[in-house]
């Protein structure tokens, strides 16, 4: 009996090490740590926010963006986290990715992660105890966990994109990454290309629904006394080369205009010349590296303070 008990303790300790150390840089884990404090400014959104925002230490801000996320879950995170973590009158940056209006997102794109970071009240009938257990006790559900623990003990925690400060790709390689991104969008959203403004009828229907969600998020911020700011993050010159003005207007700007009925501040950096240099990106064409994120966020804070005066 004592042997079984001892083995159980060892396994639980391994899980805690795996959860708190090996996975410490996972966005979900950063979010959980971020929920322990109060801030003057917070950001919500998807991958473009995750790899676009890095608040300087003296700014008292936190980035709650999560990769592969659409407005459905962003809305839930905003409503649960802002009252808990944002100081009265604080700023809410709503990061709007190029194709974020193209999908509502319910039950899609790693939705099993949300029971770890959102309450049962927020998720309603989507809440799954099994998914919570999978996320909270990952050692028991990952056959590679022991190998990852050993690698972490030897080499240290994997920081991924967190510390990358230079794009190791040349322009042609970065352009190829941009083309791959656009091709994946065409596959995912059934687009002909990223040059025309003609899109499928079903996408128009999703635009209508996602615009309503964004309008609701803006209204929530006003009702709670927060300062919402809509933000389109920059992408490199290589990425911009692959997207026409007509396409971006159709899938992004027209939807922002439709959703922003309260005319809240909108800061658009998509083609901003200050952030076109490919050296600011993380071995791709549209995710800023650590240096680029910090430079951009400093400018974002300055600009948002200016427009609020």
Stretches with model-predicted labels:
Residues 1-16:
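Hydrophobic membrane-insertion alpha-helices, especially the h-region
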Residues 18-38:
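Alpha-helical transmembrane signal-anchor/signal-peptide segments
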Residues 38, 87-91, 225-227:
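A general structural motif
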Residues 48-136:
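Membrane-embedded segments
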Residues 109-224:
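Secreted/periplasmic serine-hydrolase-like ester/acetyl group-modifying domain
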Residues 282-309:
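Histidine-centered active-site loop/cap adjacent to the catalytic His
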